[in-house]
């Protein structure tokens, strides 16, 4: 019996099939640098600071705090809602009030844990009196939303409600007619 280490065996095998591959037992970095958890966290923190630094914003002036996100930033499912309500403004996380309870039930019904997805909103500050964000407010925050999506880089993007739909496809559509229709959205050159 002749004992050979794995490197010799692999080299012999690759030579036998005329491969140009060179064996190496060095670990393979499977994630791109921009996908490393530390880099993603840093990008999210920088984005959060940019949003917090917005000046001359009525939403910010009437809200208690910025509501940025909740959930697993490594998730391949990203959910985008309208904007924070009173409960979200108090807690600092999206989908914490009645809409959050409904979302939790819907996710449980399809055996998905809330903690396993990533959640954000179109606007990050509560509109006064829980009103719907205006088109101008949606437009103001859209660049931050698109950057947020680009950082998370989900495989599935779920938009919840008319405001989220407007942020992606404009206000010439009615949600009642678009509900249930799959659409491709291009953000920063990538199709979602």
Where are these regions (language model features)?
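A polyanion-binding, active-site-adjacent surface
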Residues: 3, 8-192
């Amino acid at each position: 019996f002749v004992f050979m280490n794995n490197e010799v065996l692999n080299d012999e095998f690759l030579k036998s099939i005329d491969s140009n591959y060179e064996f190496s037992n060095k670990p393979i970095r499977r994630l791109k640098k921009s996908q490393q958890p530390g880099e993603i966290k840093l990008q999210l923190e920088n984005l959060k600071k940019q949003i917090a630094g917005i000046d001359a914003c009525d939403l910010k002036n009437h809200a208690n705090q910025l509501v940025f996100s909740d959930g697993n930033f490594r998730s391949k499912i990203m959910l985008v809602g309208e904007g924070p309500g009173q409960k979200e403004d108090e807690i600092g996380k999206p989908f914490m009030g009645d809409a959050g309870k409904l979302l939790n039930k819907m996710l449980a019904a399809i055996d998905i844990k809330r903690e396993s997805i990533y959640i954000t909103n179109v606007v990050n500050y509560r509109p006064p009196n829980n009103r719907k964000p205006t088109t101008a407010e949606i437009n103001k925050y859209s660049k931050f939303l698109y950057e947020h999506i680009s950082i998370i880089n989900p495989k599935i993007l779920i938009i919840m409600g008319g405001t989220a739909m407007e942020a992606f496809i404009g206000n010439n559509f009615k949600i009642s007619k678009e509900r249930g229709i799959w659409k491709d959205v291009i953000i920063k050159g990538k199709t979602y």
